[in-house]
Amino acid sequence: MKLMTMPSEFQKALPILTKIKEAGYEAYFVGGSVRDVLLERPIHDVDIATSSYPEETKAIFNRTVDVGIEHGTVLVLENGGEYEITTFRTEDVYVDYRRPSQVSFVRSLEEDLKRRDFTVNALALDENGQVIDKFRGLIDLKQKRLRAVGKAEERFEEDALRIMRGFRFAASLDFDIEAATFEAMRSHSPLLEKISVERSFTEFDKLLMAPHWRKGISAMIACQAYDYLPGLKQQEAGLNHLIVSLKDNFTFSDHHQAWAYVMISLAIEDPKSFLKAWKTSNDFQRYVTKLIALYRIRQERSFEKLDIYQYGKEMASLVEDLRKAQSLSVDMDRINTLDQALVIHDKHDIVLNGSHLIKDFGMKPGPQLGLMLEKVELAIVEGRLDNDFTTIEAFVREELAP
């Protein structure tokens, strides 16, 4: 198969391939970018594979950076762009089901492609637009099928994260997993416990943000892979609820909303501990737990002005988005009205601060000072007090009166 036109991302990188070939080596576009252009999807990263060894690659170009030279990768700075160029390689026995004990550089494109995870990711493209397909990836692409390269059992024993990648690609590409590949994923799912939580989180997160995320979750359920992921053991019912409780065309607005609703569906009692088990950042934990708290408030009643002040319009909108997807009552107009009615959106908007209370009222730093500032803040938010220096001073004076 030959491309009639090369996408602009590849055209810009063609001089890189030309230089490498003029130096006497082979060079191809490889991986996800080739797959995506054939599927007419947006291209993100342009990856180049070459028969030149790292030191040979560096000798060809003036500006290079060693970003992963032990694995054969050199970053080339050329034509205003950055390109990762990786030497064809084979990988020795894998350690802990996640990383090769040794990487060997080779001159053969086929040897390089045969170590990849799925056939649709094992395609290469030359400078003339000719697709190189050694493992029937084009047929799988046409039939929307995800199939492991070579023996599926070996691919998942080498790196068990490929199981999570399989779920993610099913979700992002809307592909069905080929039977033998699926069975190998199912039988090797216990190996997911050997994978770093951070790597599993990245794949699960991408799955949740994919347009066909239900397909990825359904495959995970069928494989019983969830039993080997943090906080998901014996959570088949909760994951099924996640799939069926939202409208068919619903996709999550952002990562916070997705993970919040996962925990809502699973009825997680301690969201922070759940997210800690996934080794997420403190900021991520803080935002998602607040989002769940606001969702639960909304289950009980309509939003009030204080809710919008404390949680923000954006977070309230994410909650309403989830409610709409469940065919529950939604009131975005109320959120906008309450937000517009707020005199302040943050305590730093208050014209008087702790320093004024210490200087003008002789208050001492400590709990009493903090409590007074909270009273001022609440009174302003609720509309009982103007955000005016003189008015606030009078309010404080009255509060301090014996």
UniProtKB/Swiss-Prot annotation:
SUPFAM superfamilies assigned: Nucleotidyltransferase, Poly A polymerase C-terminal region-like
Cofactor: Mg(2+)
Broad enzyme group: transferase
Binding site for Mg(2+): D45, D47
EC number: 2.7.7.72
Database matches in HAMAP family: CCA_bact_type3 (MF_01263)
Entry protein name: CCA-adding enzyme
Lineage of origin: Bacteria, Bacillati, Bacillota, Bacilli, Lactobacillales
